[in-house]
């Protein structure tokens, strides 16, 4: 829970208020290039991992620990990749060819089909976000209250950071607030584990808060763009 000021009191004093719940889906990753990794041993005796990844240093650490070898024995090369959007912020295809090459000394590669990539990648976190907002007679937004319920799926990778950004990146857009509150819960469910996805939680939160501000502007009979111009930092 993060709170500044007395949200309930300020909202009760606002001339215009809105309360609405918004739902965002667990969109699937569909980067053009699927997960793929090639491995070989170099002339220094190092395991070279050539991978379509967004996290080369994490891959180096993970492969080293999986094989129980020092990180100095692993070199990760990250070429220009054909899209990642957050899906490749998880180690997916690197471990198996790394094991094969380290055990046999021979080159190896692993290329995922589109179907395999969709099974193994991490979709966006599904969220249910409740927003309360209030403004005075001049259209100045005085209070924002955001509660996010995030579905992380079967495992909690990126769960605490993405849900945090749903509030931190949305409430902060408005500079005249006298009070704000942000609270969240994350739940495990028996579905595909969610992870990093473009916007990283901010997308869901901003969609909800901006939708609430649009509805608030409609109540006030004002242009939503005008309301946002009046309330956002210059």
Map each language-model feature to its residues.
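Structural alpha/beta core scaffold segments of enzyme domains
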Residues: 1-234
């Amino acid at each position: 829970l993060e709170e500044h000021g007395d949200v309930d009191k300020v909202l009760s004093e606002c001339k215009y208020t809105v309360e609405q719940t918004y739902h965002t889906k667990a969109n699937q990753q569909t980067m053009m290039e699927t997960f793929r990794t090639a491995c070989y041993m170099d002339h220094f005796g190092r395991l070279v991992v050539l991978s379509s990844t967004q996290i080369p240093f994490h891959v180096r650490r993970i492969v080293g620990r999986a094989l129980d070898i020092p990180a100095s024995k692993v070199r990760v090369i990250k070429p220009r990749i054909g899209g990642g959007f957050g899906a490749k912020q998880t180690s997916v295809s690197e471990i198996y060819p790394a094991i094969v090459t380290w055990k046999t000394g021979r080159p190896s590669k692993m290329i995922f089909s589109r179907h395999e990539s969709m099974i193994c990648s991490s979709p966006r976190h599904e969220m249910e976000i409740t927003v309360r907002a209030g403004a005075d007679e001049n259209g100045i937004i005085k209070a924002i209250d955001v509660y996010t319920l995030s579905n992380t799926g079967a495992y909690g990778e990126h769960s605490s950071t993405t849900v945090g950004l749903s509030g931190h990146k949305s409430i902060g857009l408005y500079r005249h607030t006298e009070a704000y509150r942000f609270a969240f819960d994350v739940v495990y469910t028996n579905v595909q584990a969610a992870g990093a996805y473009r916007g990283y939680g901010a997308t869901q939160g901003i969609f909800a808060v901006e939708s609430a501000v649009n509805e608030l502007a409609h109540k006030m009979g004002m242009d939503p763009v005008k309301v946002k111009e009046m309330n956002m930092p210059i």
